[in-house]
């Protein structure tokens, strides 16, 4: 029986790079620290649409590169939002110095992470899952992606029995290592329970 492999992990070093760069003896401690940093950032900049968090460590300095759909929301008036974020990080990890740089995502509708987050938000607003999927597919096709696949799993439309449904358009060559498949998962917390969202995107060249 064939097994599915993670599309991003499968392509590390070919079309994708690691999201953290550091070498350390205290591997498990720093890995947990990275996870906590990512969780804090995702909670803080939820409305800004965070697509990627890149962490680079140099001794006691951390360089954060945040890829955002709407960086202006995070920056806020006179950069107050960014200052507050830096203060929160410094308070929680006082032994580290922080450098934060923001990168605007040029094409949010062709980004699997942002599209999965958007779709999860629509499901939380009680929009019918088929309609939400159609809208997400239309947004991606409008910007000219080569292929897209969306799968939702759970108690869809409040059904008693959980199930999975998926829709695909265009080419999604999961076995082709040269294909830079963009993959993301998100959770929609509805009154009926959690609905899982998966998005695969094959961007245009």
UniProtKB/Swiss-Prot annotation:
Residue ranges of every copy of the KH type-2 domain listed in the record: 37-106
GO cellular component terms listed in the entry, alphabetical order: chloroplast; cytosolic small ribosomal subunit
Keywords, ordered alphabetically: Chloroplast, Plastid, Ribonucleoprotein, Ribosomal protein, RNA-binding, rRNA-binding
Keyword check for Cytoplasm: no
GO function terms (MF aspect): mRNA binding; rRNA binding; structural constituent of ribosome
Location(s) in or outside the cell: Plastid, Chloroplast
CDD domains assigned: KH-II_30S_S3
Main location: plastid
Source organism, top-level taxon: Eukaryota
InterPro entries tied to this protein: KH_dom-like_a/b, KH_dom_type_2, KH_sf_prok-type, Ribosomal_S3_C_sf, Ribosomal_uS3_bac-typ, Ribosomal_uS3_C, Ribosomal_uS3_CS
Gene3D superfamilies documented for this protein: 3.30.300.20, Ribosomal protein S3, C-terminal domain
NCBIfam families tied to this protein: rpsC_bact
PANTHER family in the record: 30S/40S RIBOSOMAL PROTEIN S3, SMALL RIBOSOMAL SUBUNIT PROTEIN US3C
Subunit details: Part of the 30S ribosomal subunit.
Record protein name field: Small ribosomal subunit protein uS3c
Species of origin: Cyanidioschyzon merolae (strain NIES-3377 / 10D)
